[in-house]
Amino acid sequence: MVESINSLEELGTVAKTEAAAPVDVQKLDAQGRAYATGKRKDAVARVWVKPGTGKITVNDKEFEKYFARPVLQMILQQPIVASNRAGQFDIVATVAGGGLSGQAGAVRHGISKALTYYEPGLRTVLKKGGFLTRDSRVVERKKYGKAKARRSFQFSKR
C-alpha cells in the first residue's frame, strides 16, 4: 500500500477511497453480553449487560438488598431511566473496594458504559447526562504538620 504511492495526488485519492473505521459497533462477548468496568473513588465495578427482564444483580444479591438506601438505588438506575430502557436489560455487576456510595457510583458508571457498548446509539443521551464521565474526585491525602488533609492543629497563643 505505502510503496505504491508516488505523489501527493495519489496520496489524496487513496485517502479519499479508504473507508473510515466504523464508530458505532456493538462490543459483545460470546454469550451476547456487553462488558464494561466502572470506577468511583476506591470502588471498581465489573458490569455485564444482556437483554432480559430488567433484573439487576450486584455481588450475587438483588440490588435492592445490596444497596438498602433508596438514594443509592436511584443512583444505580439513573442511566437506565435516562435512556428509557427500564425492564429491557438484565444487569450483573461485581463491585469491590470503597464504601456503598462509591460502589453505587462505580456500578452506575459501568452500566452506562456497558449500555453504550450494547447499543451505541445511546451514547449521546448518556454523555449529555454525564453518566459516561469518570468522576475523578478522590479523598485528599493527609499532610504532615496538619491534623487532617487541611485542618490544622488547635492553635494556642499562650
Swiss-Prot record:
What PROSITE patterns does this protein's entry cite?
RIBOSOMAL_S9 (PS00360)
Q: Which domain of life is it from?
A: Bacteria
Is this entry keyworded Protein transport?
A: no
Q: Which Pfam families match?
A: Ribosomal_S9
Q: Which InterPro entries match?
A: Ribosomal_Su5_D2-typ_SF, Ribosomal_uS9, Ribosomal_uS9_bac/plastid, Ribosomal_uS9_CS, Ribsml_uS5_D2-typ_fold_subgr
Might you name a Gene Ontology BP term for this protein? translation
Per the UniProt record, the lineage of the source organism begins with: Bacteria, Pseudomonadati, Pseudomonadota, Alphaproteobacteria, Hyphomicrobiales
What's the protein here called?
Small ribosomal subunit protein uS9
Give me the segments passing through the membrane: none
Gene designation = rpsI
Q: Name one GO cellular component term.
A: cytosolic small ribosomal subunit
**GO function terms (MF aspect):** RNA binding; structural constituent of ribosome
Entry's family note = Belongs to the universal ribosomal protein uS9 family.
Record keywords = Ribonucleoprotein, Ribosomal protein
